[in-house]
């Protein structure tokens, strides 16, 4: 059919393929858009052109535009709006354009989940749900799910004679718990939801175990997987033998081996003529392979030792390959493999029914709570859009409404989403209106059950001329990256990707072509940095082994030093906004990694090089000391009878006990809970430790009561305040980060309380489940990712982004194979597979289905990882740097040389399929580059024609592991110092340190004066010292602490504490009437009940002195003018330094703070009254003598009070009085005199 593409204007900047994508119509369109090909711009332009064409009679609300993320949807809507406004600016009278601008906010431009939500909100009655439902977050959904699942299992256990269920439990769980069954049901539920009809998929899962009518394994639906695997491995064995024969044929090669090797090869080649219709024939053919003993070389000196060893090594590899085929596929008889599946069928049937029950119960529970989760949206939308297996009336209405449906990132859709899109698009193939954009090479979300085969099927059936089921348009030109980056990517992936292994051919249509030209330079050549670890043992290492940790450290230091070198050398970067080169900045650099396990090492390495660093890490939050301590404390508040959390809290800075003290507590009660021992120790011991424990127990009881009365956030904040733990961690190294983590804990508790769950117990349980499942939350961020920092993120997080310089790290980290080697495997095509467990004999056998699906999942994982690597390499705009460690470069390069003689561009299938890490692919690909040939001086390397610029640098770990050398040097220096000998090395910072030591600060006088002082402190500086004075003038607005310092607790109250108690009572006494003794005693009882005053403080208060005050002229005045009285008035006041210190001549001001006990504020004047508890009677000869001392002591204080209050209020301080409780003396202070 004709594409009806209008001619491209000569002035157009669009490529021919981009123009086709913008203009194509009349059929479904698939745009295969390579990385950096401008797909978003094409998509937006297509939409805008359609909308501004008034002859098309298209409104924006007649388009459905689906994006992958909310951010993408917002950006899409913004770009369309901007385009419409520009068009309206050129044609301001257009009613059509005005209408489009007005309709834009009502247009369906969103994620598919949001579109489904829109359908449900509008047609809720079709799905039979409450329209007032609330959409919940995954956290709340998981908590409801766990409750429902536990309830279901408990119900099943309670059913009498439920033999099928009990057999299932015995078959799939351990002896101690049913956690495995719990997890299996949950996994199956999630997996089934990726299918349009989950129940149908679960039922089909059971049918794969129906083998009654099957007589041979070759009849099983998944036999093609088995055949493919055997063929691949036989071919690999053949290649091993061919390599061995090549070495035997070399000059000085082990020629006597040739006859044996050729006989081996004949046997292997004969397997290519196998009868694949008979499993018995296959088994016999494989088992009959006979590798004869290789002959002994008589004169070994006549042969090259390397050739001899290589020939032996390759033959042994071939023997091992054939042995593995026999072990994996033919270890049991055919009849046993088939009978195992039949025996498992009842368990699988029970499991299927159990998952269906759970799904129904889970949905019912959410309905009762009036909530839905994200997984419900797609399936409820499907329920509304489907009528049986046909489009419902609602779906038909959408088909009429949407004149075109456009979907971005189509390669990441699943079967449910595909069905929804099909139901709202035109069902006629001849008039298809679905426009899909994506790149299957960037499909990296299989773990989210994305289905890249949907894209591939259309890619293979759609034709570029539109003659097939739709139109296919390839956008291969890359406008993001320099030629150096594209050449490197193409060179590697031409050798890696084909339909067999990667599910797509990397042909001329798929490879990247240069779109934006820039001058070539060697500085932009792709770099491969290999760090030779020499002694590493890759046979036994895992991701958390000491070897792997050391690899992370070395790699991190390599990268940090490389970044420091680029920054210091002002590496030139082309700035697209400035349209010119500029020196590189930290923000230009990103470090990409498959996982973030090396982030802490990377951060440490960056600190050493003084490089600002931001790691987008979603783990490590619960492991931080401050968060772990708070979680432990909350567990103890919830239930103190938990030994480990209790010990953690006691040992933490909150309580501060040491190991010896913890041991003493346990000795108080050797058996039972540690909390009982704690209580026993408190009661039988008199010590400082016992006092600490007593205080803690009282505080713990208060928190436990608070946890019942108040919400969770109130409890957490109260703990922060009472323990000062938040302030404490702020003073530790990394204090800002630690405080951010504690704030995040408060925020997350607040979010939790907004769910349908409440309370401390549930929150603690929720956190425990997150920890068990490994669902960490990620530490709080104190540095924004948009700042001038080097960023580190996962490759998945980088998808859709671009960076001037990309450093890909962790290339030698092993692929995550946990899912493949899991006890149970799930597959979209074949359902569920696991080992067969004979519960009577307690023997476990691998099933043929399990082996087949394991191979299938392994191939899918390899294809996915290949696409992940493609995404990583295509993020770079200017420069690509690849960093990896190798256990032994000499041995590793020899392994790569095995494929160096290959003449085909594509690497052998087995080499690609058996890769364990990215470096296996990159090494085997780049070994055929001329740069490697020059490095290794190996003539046997068959280099491939390429324009890729590659710089290879081999480093050793000793270049980076300097700590040991530095420690040895420091030990030598220490010996020199002990012997009074000079240190042989002079610090390079000597001159800089000298400058610091000799520096004189110009405003030194200001450093001796505090920027903020209390009036009390000033009074001390300018007046006589008196231990009986009340010096607590700066009062805090918080609950009075009942805890006295430990060294004072056994003594009577100090004069200061007595004064504080008197002031507290004076603040609380009512001025409505003259108080009596009974009034004051009742008030004190109330204050004790509210924990405002302690028993000791009440006992120390002299009630008679309080009563005497109200008999004095000042007291009577306060009672008469009660409405004008203000008590405990705080103030802050800036005062010039020169007014405080006569001999200091600097232009600075000091912040003065204080609290006025009482003041009578009239219309124009203020009277100040300050209470004093100084000892007067019996200490001075008479009041005249005392008054002179008191005026001198308190003159500064009252003068500052008066000046501050007068300045703040704007009213004159008419009088200022001191009232002394001891002796009922009144002293008036002249506030006009100088300081």
From Swiss-Prot:
Keyword rRNA processing belongs to the record: no
CDD domains the UniProt entry points to: DEXQc_UvrD
InterPro entries the record matches: AddA, DNA_helicase_UvrD-like_C, DNA_helicase_UvrD/REP, P-loop_NTPase, PDDEXK-like_dom_sf, PDDEXK_AddAB-type, Restrct_endonuc-II-like, UvrD-like_ATP-bd
The UvrD-like helicase ATP-binding domain, residue ranges: 12-482
Pfam families: PDDEXK_1 (PF12705), UvrD-helicase (PF00580), UvrD_C (PF13361)
Alphabetic keyword roster: ATP-binding, DNA damage, DNA repair, DNA-binding, Exonuclease, Helicase, Hydrolase, Isomerase, Nuclease, Nucleotide-binding
Cofactor: Mg(2+)
Reaction equations catalysed: Couples ATP hydrolysis with the unwinding of duplex DNA by translocating in the 3'-5' direction; ATP + H2O = ADP + phosphate + H(+)
Domain of life: Bacteria
GO molecular function: 3'-5' DNA helicase activity; 3'-5' exonuclease activity; ATP binding; ATP hydrolysis activity; double-stranded DNA binding
EC number of the protein: 3.1.-.-, 5.6.2.4
Gene Ontology terms describing biological process: double-strand break repair via homologous recombination
Subunit structure: Heterodimer of AddA and AddB/RexB.
Family: Belongs to the helicase family. AddA subfamily.
NCBIfam families on file: addA_Gpos (TIGR02785)
Name the UniProt record assigns to this protein: ATP-dependent helicase/nuclease subunit A
Gene that specifies this protein: addA
């Amino acid at each position: 059919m004709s594409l009806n593409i209008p001619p491209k204007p000569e002035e157009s900047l669009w490529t021919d393929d981009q123009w086709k994508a913008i203009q194509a119509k009349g059929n479904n369109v698939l745009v295969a858009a390579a990385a950096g090909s401008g797909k978003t711009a094409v998509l937006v332009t297509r939409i805008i052109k359609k909308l501004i064409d008034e002859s098309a009679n298209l409104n924006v609300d007649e388009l459905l535009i689906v994006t992958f993320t909310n951010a993408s949807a917002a950006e899409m809507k913004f770009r369309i709006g901007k385009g419409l406004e520009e068009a309206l600016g050129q044609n301001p009278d257009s009613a059509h354009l005005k209408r489009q601008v007005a309709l834009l906010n009502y247009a369906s431009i969103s994620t598919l989940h949001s579109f489904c939500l829109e359908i449900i909100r509008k047609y809720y009655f079709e799905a039979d749900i409450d329209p007032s439902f609330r959409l919940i977050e995954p956290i709340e959904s998981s908590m409801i799910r766990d409750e429902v699942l536990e309830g279901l299992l408990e119900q099943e256990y309670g059913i009498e004679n439920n033999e099928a269920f009990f057999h299932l439990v015995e078959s799939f769980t351990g002896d101690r718990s049913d956690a495995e069954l719990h997890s299996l049901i949950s996994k199956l539920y999630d997996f089934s939801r990726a299918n349009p009809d989950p129940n149908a998929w679960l039922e089909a899962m059971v049918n794969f175990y129906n083998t009654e009518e099957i007589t041979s394994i070759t009849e099983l639906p998944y036999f093609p997987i088995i055949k493919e695997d055997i063929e691949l491995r036989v071919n690999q064995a053949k290649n091993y033998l061919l390599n061995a024969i090549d070495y035997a044929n070399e000059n000085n090669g082990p020629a006597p081996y040739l006859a044996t090797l050729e006989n081996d090869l004949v046997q292997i080649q004969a397997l290519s003529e196998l009868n694949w219709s008979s499993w018995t024939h296959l088994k016999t053919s494989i088992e009959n392979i006979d590798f004869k003993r290789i002959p002994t070389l008589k004169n070994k000196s006549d042969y090259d030792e390397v050739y001899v060893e290589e020939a032996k090594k390759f033959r042994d590899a071939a023997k091992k390959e054939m042995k593995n085929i026999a072990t994996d596929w033919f270890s049991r008889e055919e009849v046993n493999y088939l009978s195992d599946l039949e025996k498992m069928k009842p368990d699988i049937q029970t499991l299927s029914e159990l998952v269906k029950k759970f799904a129904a119960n889970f949905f019912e529970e959410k309905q009762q709570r009036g909530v839905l989760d994200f997984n419900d949206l797609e399936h409820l939308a499907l329920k509304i859009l489907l009528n049986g297996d046909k489009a419902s009336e609602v779906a038909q209405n959408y088909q009429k409404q949407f004149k075109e449906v456009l979907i971005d990132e189509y390669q990441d859709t699943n079967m449910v989403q595909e069905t929804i899109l099909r139901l709202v698009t035109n069902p006629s193939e001849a008039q298809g209106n679905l426009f899909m954009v994506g790149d299957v090479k960037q499909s990296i979300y299989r773990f989210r059950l994305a289905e890249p085969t949907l894209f591939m099927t259309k890619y293979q059936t759609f034709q570029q001329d539109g003659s097939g089921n739709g139109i296919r348009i390839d956008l291969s030109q890359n406008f993001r990256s320099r030629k150096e980056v594209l050449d490197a990517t193409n060179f590697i992936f031409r050798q890696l990707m084909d339909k067999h292994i990667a599910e797509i051919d990397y042909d001329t249509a798929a490879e990247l072509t240069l779109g934006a030209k820039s001058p070539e330079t060697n500085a932009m050549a792709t770099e491969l940095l290999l760090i030779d670890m020499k002694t590493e043992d890759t046979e036994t290492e895992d991701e958390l082994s000491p070897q792997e940790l050391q690899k992370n450290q070395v790699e991190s230091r390599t990268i940090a030093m490389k970044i420091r070198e680029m920054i210091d050398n002002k590496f030139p970067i082309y700035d697209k906004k400035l349209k010119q080169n500029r020196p590189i900045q930290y923000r230009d650099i990103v470090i990409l990694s498959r996982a973030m396990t090396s982030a802490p090492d990377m951060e440490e390495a960056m600190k050493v090089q003084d490089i600002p660093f931001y790691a987008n890490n979603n783990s490590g939050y619960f492991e931080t000391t401050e968060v772990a301590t708070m979680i432990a404390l909350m567990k103890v508040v919830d239930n103190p009878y938990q030994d480990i959390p209790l010990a953690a809290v006691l040992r933490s800075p909150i309580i501060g006990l040491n190991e010896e003290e913890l041991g003493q507590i346990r000795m108080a009660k050797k058996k039972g809970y540690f909390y009982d021992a704690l209580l026993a120790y408190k009661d039988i011991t008199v010590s400082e430790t016992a006092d600490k424990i007593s205080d803690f127990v009282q505080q713990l009881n208060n928190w436990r009561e608070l946890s019942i009365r108040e919400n969770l956030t109130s409890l957490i904040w109260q703990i922060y305040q009472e323990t000062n733990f938040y302030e404490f961690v702020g003073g530790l190294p990394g204090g800002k980060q630690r405080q951010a983590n504690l704030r995040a804990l408060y925020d997350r508790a607040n979010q939790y309380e907004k769910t349908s769950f409440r309370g401390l117990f549930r929150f603690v349980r929720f956190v425990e489940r997150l920890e068990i499942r490994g669902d960490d939350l990620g530490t709080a961020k104190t540095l924004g990712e948009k700042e001038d920092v080097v960023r580190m993120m996962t490759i998945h997080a980088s998808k859709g982004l671009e960076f001037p310089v990309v450093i890909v790290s962790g290339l030698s980290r092993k692929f995550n194979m946990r899912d493949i080697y899991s006890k149970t495997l799930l597959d979209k095509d074949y359902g569920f597979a696991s080992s067969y467990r004979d519960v009577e004999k307690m023997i476990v056998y691998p099933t043929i289905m399990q082996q087949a699906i394991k191979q299938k999942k392994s191939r899918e994982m390899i294809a996915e990882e290949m696409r992940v690597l493609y995404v990583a390499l295509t993020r770079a705009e200017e420069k690509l740097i690849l960093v990896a460690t190798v256990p032994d470069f000499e041995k590793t390069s020899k392994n790569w040389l095995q494929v160096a003689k290959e003449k085909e561009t594509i690497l052998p299938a087995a080499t690609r399929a058996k890769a364990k890490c990215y470096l296996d692919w990159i090494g085997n690909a780049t070994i055929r580059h001329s740069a490697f040939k020059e490095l290794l001086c190996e003539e046997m390397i068959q280099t491939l024609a390429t324009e890729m610029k590659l710089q290879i640098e081999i480093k050793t770990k000793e270049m980076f592991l300097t700590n040991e050398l530095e420690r040895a040097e420091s030990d030598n220096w220490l010996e020199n110092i002990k012997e009074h000998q000079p240190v042989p090395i002079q610090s390079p910072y000597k001159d800089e340190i000298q400058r610091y030591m000799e520096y004189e600060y110009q405003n030194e006088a200001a450093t001796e004066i505090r920027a903020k002082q209390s009036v009390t402190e000033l009074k001390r500086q300018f007046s006589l010292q008196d231990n009986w004075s009340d010096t607590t003038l700066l009062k805090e607005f918080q609950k009075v602490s009942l805890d006295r310092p430990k060294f004072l607790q056994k003594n009577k109250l100090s004069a200061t504490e007595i004064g504080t108690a008197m002031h507290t009572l004076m603040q609380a006494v009512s001025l409505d009437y003259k108080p009596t003794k009974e009034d004051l005693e009742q008030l004190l009882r109330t204050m004790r009940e509210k924990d405002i005053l302690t028993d000791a403080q009440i006992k120390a208060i002299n009630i008679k002195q309080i009563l005497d005050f109200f008999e004095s002229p000042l007291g009577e005045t306060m009672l008469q003018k009660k409405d004008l009285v203000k008590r405990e008035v705080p103030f802050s006041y800036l005062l010039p330094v020169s007014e405080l210190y006569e001999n200091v001549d600097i232009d600075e001001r000091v912040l003065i703070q204080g609290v006025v006990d009482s003041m009578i504020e009239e219309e124009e004047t203020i009277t100040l009254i300050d209470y004093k508890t100084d000892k007067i009677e019996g200490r001075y000869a008479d009041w005249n003598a005392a008054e002179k001392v008191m005026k001198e002591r308190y003159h500064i204080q009252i003068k500052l009070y008066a000046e501050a209050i007068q300045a703040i209020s704007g009213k004159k301080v008419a009088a200022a009085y001191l009232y002394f409780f001891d002796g009922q003396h009144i002293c008036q202070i002249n506030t006009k005199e100088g300081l």
